[in-house]
């Protein structure tokens, strides 16, 4: 069964993560924002989700979540699978 945003991804973000990133225009709990297919200079498609993932893994800095426990390998794999599965709702 594909990984879904509502069931598998959104619950991984703590309320403090959502509030913190909202100040920077990053809507972690908004499926439309996270699944937007638009690319940028770094990623050819789905830049919003791909930048979030890069910050979760530490490939982009500052690493997320700020001031909190970093995601486990299992949680990161789930997010990566969500992207691989096609950003399912």
Predicted regions and their residues:
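Aromatic- and Gly/Pro-enriched helix-to-coil junctions and flexible linker segments
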Residues: 1-89
């Amino acid at each position: 069964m594909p990984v879904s945003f509502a069931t598998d991804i959104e619950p991984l973000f703590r309320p403090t993560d959502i509030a913190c990133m909202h100040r920077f225009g990053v809507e972690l709990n908004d499926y439309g924002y996270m699944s937007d297919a638009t690319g940028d200079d770094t990623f050819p498609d789905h830049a919003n989700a791909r930048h979030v993932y890069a910050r979760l893994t530490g490939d982009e800095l500052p690493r997320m979540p700020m001031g909190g426990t970093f995601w486990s390998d299992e949680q990161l794999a789930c997010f990566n699978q969500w992207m691989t599965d096609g950003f399912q709702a």
